[in-house]
Regions:
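Acidic/polar, low-complexity intrinsically disordered N-terminal segments immediately downstream
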Residues: 4, 21-145
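C-terminal motif of bacterial Sec signal peptides marking the signal peptidase cleavage site
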Residues: 16-19
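Bacterial N-terminal signal peptides that target proteins for export
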Residues: 1-8
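Surface-exposed interaction regions that form or flank ligand-binding interfaces
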Residues: 13
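Loop and turn regions of beta-sandwich accessory domains that flank beta-strands and are enriched
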Residues: 68, 130-232
Length: 232
């Protein structure tokens, strides 16, 4: 059994090494890529800028600087960011830096907006994958961002949830302006909401009018999942 385990690990290591060899460009190739990003979440605090430096790497080094043009896409408003139209890899180097600044302009606390940055390929240069930033408005220092998503079933009107400030005895956010059911009446799909919670003590409560289980629900604080259910 021990030999089998050893051989298995050796096989996995060789397979992983072979896989990496297939994905990495050979030295000297005219190829450039952004540093690895598997989605990047950006939260911009009120009245502040959020600078983000992104590294760009090439597979070769040349004696002259190289300028790579960029294309921007997504639904993030142009006033919400500053991005150069190109990035430069200096002479005698294989690394450049793209300086991006996200701004507190036309951001939404509930719905993330996206900005995708692409390097333009040319006959002289192959490029890697795009990078996409998910950008949202954050909260002031001392407050946490509460964000909730509720997937509605066939009877959306029977769901009522609220967050209660137990120190003040007050409802700070709910899916209905008046305590009670009906806030989601006529709606479908996934409904989202968010707010900023100052430091304090809070209780999340959810009610189902027919007590037969509502749709899936989850909520986070500052991006960290606190609760999730499958709707059962």
């Amino acid at each position: 059994m021990k030999k089998l385990k050893l051989y298995s690990l050796l096989f996995i290591a060789v397979a992983a090494f072979s896989s990496c060899e297939e994905e990495v460009e050979a030295p000297g190739t005219a190829y450039a890529s952004f540093e690895a990003y598997l989605g990047k979440d950006i939260t911009v605090s009120p009245n502040t800028d959020f600078p983000q430096a992104v590294k760009v790497y090439s597979a070769n080094i040349t004696g002259s600087a190289r300028t790579i043009d960029l294309t921007l896409s997504g639904n993030l408003d142009a006033s919400s960011y500053e991005v150069p139209t190109s990035v430069v890899i200096p002479a005698n180097s294989n690394e450049g830096t793209l300086n991006v600044v996200f701004k507190d302009q036309n951001l939404d606390i509930i719905t993330d907006k996206t900005l995708t940055i692409s390097m333009n390929e040319s006959a002289e240069l192959s490029v890697g994958e795009d990078i996409t930033f998910n950008v949202a408005k954050g909260c002031n220092a001392g407050s946490s961002k509460f964000k909730i998503a509720v997937s509605l079933d066939d009877w959306p009107e029977e769901v009522y949830w609220r967050v209660v400030d137990t120190d003040a005895g007050a409802i700070v956010i709910a899916n209905n302006a008046t305590p009670g059911y009906g806030g989601y009446a006529g709606l479908t799909g996934t409904q989202r909401d968010a707010t900023c919670l100052p430091t304090g003590n809070y209780v999340f409560e959810i009610f189902d009018g027919y007590e037969d289980g509502a749709g899936a629900l989850s909520f986070t604080l500052d991006g960290v999942q606190v609760f999730s259910s499958n709707g059962g």
